[in-house]
Curated annotation (Swiss-Prot):
Pathway membership, UniProt: Cofactor biosynthesis; 5,6,7,8-tetrahydromethanopterin biosynthesis
Keyword Hydrolase: yes
Protein name: GTP cyclohydrolase MptA
Cofactor entry: Fe(2+)
Coiled-coil annotated residue ranges, if any: none
Disulfide bond sites: none
Any GO BP: tetrahydromethanopterin biosynthetic process
Annotated source species: Pyrococcus furiosus (strain ATCC 43587 / DSM 3638 / JCM 8422 / Vc1)
Function: Converts GTP to 7,8-dihydro-D-neopterin 2',3'-cyclic phosphate, the first intermediate in the biosynthesis of coenzyme methanopterin.
Length: 267
């Protein structure tokens, strides 16, 4: 007979709002716009723990992940997940069958690879974007989601350009866009990436032939921006396209300084 020490009372009775597992890696397949995308996501799953119980049953959280994606579970195979948040919600629904709780969270981090065309030669380039999706079930049963994207671009300094006969310094910039919204709100990670990427002086590319490199440099010089300009443009576009709480953070890795610069905004 198994002794369930998790069900015993703790020495110190304190309610814990988040207890679970983190840094669990697995594999997931998502169908989007008629294509199957394979991800190697990292999961963080947490539930709340009442003050009268010593611990949670960690293995049940792991089972909820593996069973959701396992071909051994027939009802899951019949439904191909259409998004990372759909996958996260299915994990929460499975936790509901395995472990008592009032509140639950599933966070999924991964890399989304999108096909792009280089600006001059038109060659195909595959670009990586860090994404994160969180689905949260509150104690009242309501469901919300958090979508995050991180995009790499670049900026050309307008101040140096204005004071140096058109010459300026260029740096890599990294922008993050986060949206917290109702679960049923339809927001695609690809659309969030497009909002961010179009707000830099220029996008960056994995593949650049000489004509492409020249095109990127010209675009940067034709479109100089402070990090502040990038943050403002992202939040402006995001407010016009998406519903929810918006957070934008842009960091510019300065090429002429030993420090970086940052701009951040909430809306």
């Amino acid at each position: 007979m198994t002794i369930e020490t998790q069900e015993e009372p703790p020495e110190i009775k304190v309610y814990l709002p988040r207890v679970g597992i983190t840094n669990l890696k697995s594999v997931a397949k998502i169908e989007w716009k008629g294509r199957i995308y394979t991800f190697i996501p990292t999961f963080e799953v947490a539930i709340d723990l009442p003050e009268e119980k010593k611990g949670i049953h960690m293995s049940r959280l792991v089972e909820s992940i593996t069973e959701t994606m396992s071909e051994a579970v027939e009802e899951e195979v019949k439904k191909v997940h259409t998004s990372l948040e759909d996958l996260a919600l299915c994990i929460i629904r499975r936790i509901e069958k395995k472990h008592s709780h009032k509140r639950a969270e599933v966070w999924i981090k991964s890399t989304l690879i999108l096909e792009r065309q280089t600006p001059a030669s038109g060659k195909t380039s595959y670009e990586p974007y860090d994404v994160e999706v969180g689905v949260i079930k509150n104690s009242d049963g309501s469901i919300k989601k958090v979508l995050k994207v991180k995009v790499i671009g670049n900026t050309a300094c307008p101040h140096a350009m204005a004071n140096n006969q058109g010459k300026t310094h260029i740096q890599r910039a990294i922008a993050e866009l986060e949206i917290e919204t109702h679960f049923n709100e339809d927001i695609a990670l690809e659309d969030m990436i497009e909002v961010v990427e179009s707000s830099f002086s220029s996008p960056t590319y994995t593949l650049l032939k000489t004509p492409d490199e020249n095109a990127v440099v010209r675009r940067m010089y034709e479109n100089p921006k402070f990090v502040e300009d990038v943050a403002r443009e992202i939040v402006y576009k995001a407010r016009n396209r998406f519903k929810g709480k918006i957070h934008v953070k842009v960091i510019s890795h300065e090429s002429i300084h030993k420090h970086d610069v940052i701009a951040e905004v909430w809306a």
